[in-house]
A protein has these predicted regions:
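Transmembrane alpha-helical segments in multi-pass inner-membrane proteins
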Residues: 247, 258, 262-323
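Transmembrane helix-bundle core of multi-pass membrane transporters
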Residues: 145-208, 235-238, 257-267, 342-345
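Short loop segments and helix-boundary regions at transmembrane helix junctions
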Residues: 27-34, 86-91, 111, 128-170, ...
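Cytosolic-side transmembrane-helix boundaries in multi-pass membrane proteins
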Residues: 1-48, 220, 227-234, 305-345
Length: 345
């Protein structure tokens, strides 16, 4: 190549032979976080807890930290369900209402039969059914996920109101169900243990199975995934079904905490929290990228913020504002990360 047509800034031959200058520590750290945002989320959570321990009275007590994790347990499970849906470039807005419906179905069945196992099975089947319906409408009828799940939100809410006659239903006393809320394993609440078990199973499914690889492939590009042999329709319906089932499990966990079935147990607030936990945890709204550990940390971050607001006796409206800010920041970070990774490849 001559000097006339040589691109501006291209190094000379002598400079090409010079050893590359290693990147600075900050640059290397930022690149590592870009490729594995869970590390950055963990650092953020640790900083939040450190600041809260200094600023917020009673935050750093053992009982309060246990309470934060207990409150994050059901949100974590629901957010993992949302993760599966977001990974295929979908979204589930029916989560909050399915929470309430599942809670009411659980308590109503328990009142009618006195059989806790049957009540939980019916509750889980309810969540599964809504997930399958959501996925089927999105895949086969071609209704956008946003519209489908929003409509199913109102259907679930109406059913919960009709079944309960608009009133909260007291859960019949059951030692096992009460123990789920009050018991612990080596000091760790059973609800947290259950959330951890669900998280481990979900991680294995996404990272160690053909189905998990298919989920990510569908999220990146459905056409390419289909040409590669992935059964795209089955994956889409399955992810919505998993999301509905996870929502039902989360509702059972929350019902055990309050020992009451309430038609308004979830609502749009729960839906928004679930999506926020997933997005703050590094899940892309554009599909194909997300992790179970990130979602867990996102849920704990959300519950930490809520706990601090309560302890500081600040208006709950601030919590909603913070949640809105978090999801906007998370979307900006996701956009910049996607651009950075695109430039590096």
């Amino acid at each position: 190549m001559t000097a006339a047509n040589k691109p501006v800034g291209e190094p000379s031959a002598s400079r090409d032979l010079a050893p590359a200058v290693p990147p600075g520590r900050l640059t290397a750290f930022l690149e590592r976080i870009s490729r594995n945002p869970t590390l950055g989320l963990m650092a953020l959570l640790m900083v939040m807890w450190l600041v809260a321990a200094i600023v917020v009275p009673r935050f750093a007590t053992f009982d309060n930290l246990r309470n934060v994790l207990r409150q994050a347990s059901d949100l974590s499970v629901a957010a993992i369900g949302e993760l599966f849906v977001l990974l295929i470039c979908g979204i589930d807005l029916s989560v909050g209402a399915v929470y309430g419906l599942t809670s009411v179905v659980l308590v109503t069945t328990m009142i009618a039969t006195g059989n806790l196992v049957l009540a939980i099975a019916v509750a889980l089947a309810t969540g599964l059914a809504f997930g399958v319906i959501n996925g089927s409408l999105v895949q086969w009828i071609r209704i956008p996920a946003f519209i489908t799940t929003l409509g199913m939100f109102y259907i679930a809410y109406a059913l919960a109101q009709m079944i309960s006659a608009g009133a909260a239903l007291r859960m019949p006393t059951d030692g096992l169900f009460v123990g789920l809320q009050t018991g612990s394993l080596f000091g760790v609440p059973y609800l947290v243990v259950l959330a951890a078990i669900v998280a481990v199973i979900a991680w294995i499914v996404l990272n160690r199975t053909t189905f998990g690889r298919s989920v990510v492939a569908v999220g990146y590009n459905r056409v390419t995934a289909g040409l590669s042999g992935v059964r795209v329709p089955r994956v889409i319906v399955a992810c919505f079904a998993i999301g509905g089932t996870m929502t039902a499990i989360a509702a059972v966990m929350l019902t055990s905490r309050i020992q009451t079935g309430e038609p308004t147990l979830g609502g749009f607030t729960t839906t928004f929290e679930t999506i926020t936990a997933a997005v703050v945890g590094g899940t892309s709204l554009f599909g194909g990228r997300g992790s179970v550990p990130g979602v867990l940390i996102g849920a704990i971050i959300i519950r930490t913020i809520g706990d601090c607001i309560v302890l500081l006796n600040i208006t709950p409206l601030l919590y909603q504002a913070v949640m809105g800010g978090l999801i906007v920041i998370a979307l900006v970070v996701d956009s910049q990360r996607s651009r950075y990774l695109g430039e590096r490849t």
